[in-house]
Amino acid sequence: NGGKLPLITSCSPGWIKYCEHYFPDMTENLSSCKSPQQMFGAMVKTYFAEKQGIDPKNIVSVSVMPCTAKKFEIGRDHQNAAGVPDVDIAITTRELARLIRRCGIEFTALPEEGFDDPMGESTGAAVIFGATGGVMEAALRTAVETLTGEELANLEFTDVRGTKGIKEA
C-alpha cells in the first residue's frame, strides 16, 4: 500500500532506542507494533478487563523478562492502551529468581495446577515471534490464513528468515 520499506521490527526496546538515537532517518521504517510484552499488557487491560468486568485501574500487570531494557519500555510514550500503563512493573528473570530464593519457594513441593490461559487458545505465531524473521513469517502466515480461510499445515517461508538474499548498496 505504499508503506515505507524495508520494514524493520524488533522486540528489543534497547535496539529500538539505539535506532532512534543513531539512525533517526530510519525511524519511519520501524514497525508501529508494540513488543509482545506491551501487546499482552494492552490486551489484559482492554480485552481481558472488559470480558471480566474489571476496571483496568484495578489490574497490576507484571512482566518477567530477561532484559533490563524492558523496564525502560514500560515508561515510553504510547504504552497505555486503556489510559493506564499497559505494563505496570517489569522485573528481570534474575530478579524473579532472587525473589523465589528469598521467599524460600520450593517448586517441587508445590501442588500441580492447570495452565492459566486468560486469553484462550494461542497460535503458532507466538512461538516464532522472537526468532530472526519470525515477526514477518507470523504476519505472512496470518495473512494467508485470513485471506484463504484455511489453516496452514507445514508451510515454510524460508526467504523471510535470516540475511540471505539481502543486498547492500
Task: Describe these PLM feature segments.
Residues 1-169:
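Iron-sulfur-associated redox domains of electron-transfer enzymes in respiratory
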